Amino acid sequence: MQIFDYDNILLLPRKCRVESRSECDASVTLGARSFRLPVVPANMKTVVDEPICLWLAQNGYFYVMHRFDLDNVKFVKQMHAKGVFASISLGVKKPDYDTVDQLVAEGLVPEYITIDIAHGHADSVKNMIGYLKQKLPGSFVIAGNIGTPEAVIDLENWGADATKVGIGPGKVCITKLKTGFGTGGWQLSALKWCARVATKPIIADGGIRDHGDIAKSVRFGASMVMIGSLFAGHEESPGRTVEVDGALFKEYYGSASDFNKGEYKHVEGKRILEPIKGKLADTLIEMEQDVQSSISYAGGRALMDIRKVNYVTLGGDNAGEHLLM
């Protein structure tokens, strides 16, 4: 098996077929809806909150609300009252089952539910998928996180409508350091490996450092890319604002950090400061333009045309050209 990550790969251009990148369609369909970009901000407390999720939904972007210190039932009710879709996160503990029961009791059906735990290839996830499919069959269920083909096969067979691939490759995740496990350092290979057996959409989660990594993720099988650090640090971001030597930063920490949990127990995340980088809307526009450019370099007009390109690996024993692998 060939091992590489985002910084080891470059995609090879094909003849351009458009006059302007604005002719390229960067949209993607997930479930019953289409979204402007194959990108979703990470469901983390320092990345998204209720106002950001509402704005994303109103402007044609996908979102997943985090599951920490949140009344999911109230959130779903509010989003539907405002005429937009509801996309929530659940764990696999009793309070999460109680949330499902409350949603059913109130006749609320979230359009998207993400089962969001650190090690998603687990019987506990199997049980929650089954419960959701029984109680809320109208919800599109995303399950993760995972990092192997075996996990993709199992989660799909258990009923997941999409899987989320990535074990600890994120900027504020230290899973590989704390446990010795994960996809950190080879996330793009793991994505390629998992996509080979997937029959349903994959969301690549973590390891994205530059906008070009979005195109690389799509090339190797992702339908959607979850990003934390590039979305943290905006003026609207919920993280606490910190001033250091006259410069403004936003706090950004992992979901399994002690900062998020409020206690030092089973910690697999850390806290960093992200320089404030302006408005979220401006970043999303720039991302869309960059993805459109990627499509034009791929010789296409639609997002999935990126999957048709060849690529090269940079450096190491595996260096060389790879044709449509």
Swiss-Prot record:
Binding-site residues, NADP(+): 202-225
Primary enzyme class: oxidoreductase
Keyword match Lyase: no
GO function terms (MF aspect): GMP reductase activity
Gene Ontology BP annotations: purine nucleotide metabolic process
Function noted in UniProt: Catalyzes the irreversible NADPH-dependent deamination of GMP to IMP. It functions in the conversion of nucleobase, nucleoside and nucleotide derivatives of G to A nucleotides, and in maintaining the intracellular balance of A and G nucleotides.
Protein name per Swiss-Prot or TrEMBL: GMP reductase
Organism: Variovorax paradoxus (strain S110)
Gene responsible for this protein: guaC
